[in-house]
């Protein structure tokens, strides 16, 4: 992954965190890593549901909309990552959870142009 893509991804995650915090979410963990991969954001929504959030960022529309890049393979990986996370947290054994996708669009100047939040994306 190029340095520019990594920086764009990090900036997108920062903007997504600000966005969900403004909606009343409480961020529990960022960039949870295990041998399978990484979950971008794990948070509690305002009604107390555990939410696994995948953040996708784009600086243009040439490669499609960010949220469409979460394909079947990525969805399966996210499910496995969430299962792994929940296995390590026995206190969450009976907690309801969902998967959301946040697409962050940046304009040419690097400012946020639009944020799309898709709840129950998987």
From Swiss-Prot:
It comes from Desulforamulus reducens (strain ATCC BAA-1160 / DSM 100696 / MI-1). It comes from the Bacteria. PANTHER family: UPF0102 PROTEIN YRAN. GO terms for molecular function: nucleic acid binding. HAMAP family: UPF0102 (MF_00048). The lineage of its organism: Bacteria, Bacillati, Bacillota, Clostridia, Eubacteriales. This is UPF0102 protein Dred_2035. Belongs to the UPF0102 family. SUPFAM superfamilies: Restriction endonuclease-like.
């Amino acid at each position: 992954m190029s340095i520019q893509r990594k920086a764009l991804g990090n900036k997108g995650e920062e903007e997504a965190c600000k966005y969900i915090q403004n909606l009343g979410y409480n961020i529990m963990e960022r960039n949870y890593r295990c041998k399978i991969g990484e979950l971008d954001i794990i948070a509690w929504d305002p009604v107390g549901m555990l939410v696994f959030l995948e953040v996708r960022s784009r600086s243009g529309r040439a490669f499609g909309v960010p949220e469409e890049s979460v394909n079947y393979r990525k969805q399966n990986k996210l499910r496995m990552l969430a299962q792994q996370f929940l296995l390590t947290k026995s206190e969450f054994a009976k907690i309801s959870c969902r998967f959301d996708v946040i697409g962050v669009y940046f304009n040419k100047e690097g400012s946020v142009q639009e944020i799309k939040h898709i709840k129950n994306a998987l």
